[in-house]
């Protein structure tokens, strides 16, 4: 085992522990989440999504990078928040930026703040778990899951929330096999566990 590998493992572990402390202490204020808490939560999301690997790729979907951003989500987010990066770049060039760990963290933190405001506006809980659901399932998917019947099929609820009609239960399960038998209640508990204190860093799945 190389010294570089050991250093990476230690760094990931320290980042995870630090993120728990920061997010625990960060306040969720009305329609927003403070920037420190958003950044702290992003560290936990990254551990859950890819174990911190900026080159992670899901073979079943377009999810790429440390935060496992889908193509459409990343393109929209960069165009909205970092227009300075668009000039002179093709869509492929913009998508390749998902390999930039710091940019990924910046974009993810901005989206966490947006998700918190959206959930608050809809009267839904703003917790580490609900914010992770918004990252994982998208805003529409998170709203549907947080508002849905506990016994409903989670993948069906997520697919139905996609207004474009491009998402199907089959596609979701192919990319996330653990969803096959999950109910809405199951996935909410899963998200809470993934973001909870004491969760062991490690790659459970890639979206």
Language-model features, listed with the residues they occupy:
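Alpha-helical segment that forms one wall of the substrate-binding/catalytic cleft
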Residues: 71, 75-132, 136-144
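Export/targeting segments at the very N-terminus of extracytoplasmic proteins
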Residues: 2-56, 98-123, 195-206
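Short, surface-exposed glycine/acidic/tryptophan-bearing loops
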Residues: 57-88, 151-156
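Low-complexity, Gly/Ser/Thr/Pro-rich intrinsically disordered linker/tail segments
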Residues: 174-207
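Extracytoplasmic
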Residues: 40, 64, 126-128
């Amino acid at each position: 085992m190389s010294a570089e590998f050991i250093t990476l493992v230690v760094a990931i572990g320290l980042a995870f522990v630090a993120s728990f402390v920061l997010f625990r202490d960060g306040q969720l204020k009305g329609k927003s989440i403070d920037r420190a808490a958003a950044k702290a939560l992003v560290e936990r999301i990254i551990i859950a999504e890819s174990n911190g690997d900026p080159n992670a790729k899901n073979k079943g979907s377009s999810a790429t990078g440390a935060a496992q951003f889908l193509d459409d989500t990343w393109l929209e987010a960069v165009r909205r928040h970092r227009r300075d990066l668009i000039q002179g770049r093709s869509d492929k060039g913009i998508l390749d930026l998902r390999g930039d760990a710091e940019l990924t963290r910046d974009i993810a933190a901005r989206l966490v703040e947006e998700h918190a405001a959206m959930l608050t506006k809809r009267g839904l809980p703003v917790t580490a778990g609900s914010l992770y659901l918004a990252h994982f399932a998208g805003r529409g998917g998170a709203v549907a899951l947080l508002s849905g019947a506990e016994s409903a099929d989670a993948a069906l609820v997520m697919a139905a929330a996609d207004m474009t009609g491009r998402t199907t239960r089959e596609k979701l399960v192919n990319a996330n096999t653990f969803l096959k038998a999950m109910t809405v209640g199951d996935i909410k508990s899963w998200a809470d566990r993934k973001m909870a204190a004491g969760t062991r860093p490690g790659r459970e799945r890639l979206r």
